[in-house]
Amino acid sequence: APEEWGWHGYHYSGFDQQYAITHGMDHTPDREGVTKGMDYVPWLLTQWKAAGHPIDVFSLHFYPQEGEYSDSDKPEVERARNRSTRDLWDPTYKDPTWIDSVVALIPMMRQWVNQYYYPGTPIALTEYNWGGEHHMNGATAQADVFGIFGREGLDIATRWGDLAPDMTVYKAIKLYRNYDDHGGAFGDISLAAHTPDPDEVSAFAARRKADGAVTLVVINKRLDAPAHVRISLTNLPDQGKVQVWRLADNVLTHEPDTKYSEGVLTATLPQQSILLLVLPREKKASVKRS
């Protein structure tokens, strides 16, 4: 709860939003008379806290507002998908739509729940969708969103809409959750990963608790150009084996294993493609005593 639909729902009550349809936003009765100028959701959290502990998870909905939530493959919409995932985390990104504000949704949700409710309460995004479900641009957006959710510490996410195995977005999700059809998944302990321009190429890393493998997802969002990446690996062995999965042109493939050396891994990603690299944990040699 409260499952508010989006930006205005976070800041204004349902009554104020309806009132504004015919009267504009200059006078908002609930904000002036009930919340006393507080944004609606923070005010609601204070009321819930005063009532005890009525909710176990703080949840909202969010949809980007530049036409991304569609199946459009127009270049302007695809470029919007590439950048608007920053609404989920980036305190320097001002949303260019009618929102006209920094969103930084996941940090904002965490700050609200810690300040106005009970610190550490799980946070959830129980509706979201970046569209492009039948295009590689939608797949790269979904992969970017999943990586952001993990890195930023979102506890629960439920995507709005049906999925089918032939959809690009389905395959992007599979790359994270079951890439080998045997439960192989992206790691659950987030590791730092940085790229110079996440609107062009983004990357996410995590270690798996189960077997200690390091998993790395690299996403080439470029509409019409490959990405040549040089990955510097720190706090890992200087050399080792790498398992490779790739999603390109709506085909998910397991490619031949490769190796890295001197702490550096290089790869080339076709336009609008996703690369999953799995670095198995090296087994220590055992010594038998006689």
Each language-model region and where it sits:
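C-terminal accessory region downstream of the catalytic core in glycan-modifying enzymes
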Residues: R230-T258
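Divalent cation-coordinating acidic motifs and surrounding scaffolds
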Residues: H11, D87-W89, Y93-K94, I99-A104, ...
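Carbohydrate-binding surface patches
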Residues: D197-D238, L275-V278
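Active-site proximal loops enriched in glycine and acidic residues that flank catalytic Cys/His/Asp
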Residues: L125-W130, T158-D162, V218-R222, I231-N235, ...
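C-terminal beta-strand-rich structural cap/linker in extracellular carbohydrate-active enzymes
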Residues: Y260-S290
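Glycan-recognition and catalytic regions of carbohydrate-active enzymes
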Residues: H135, F146-T215, A248
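Noncatalytic carbohydrate-binding groove/subsite architecture in carbohydrate-active enzymes
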Residues: A1-N137, Q142
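Short, exposed beta-strand/loop patches in secreted or surface proteins that constitute
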Residues: A205-R207, E255-S261
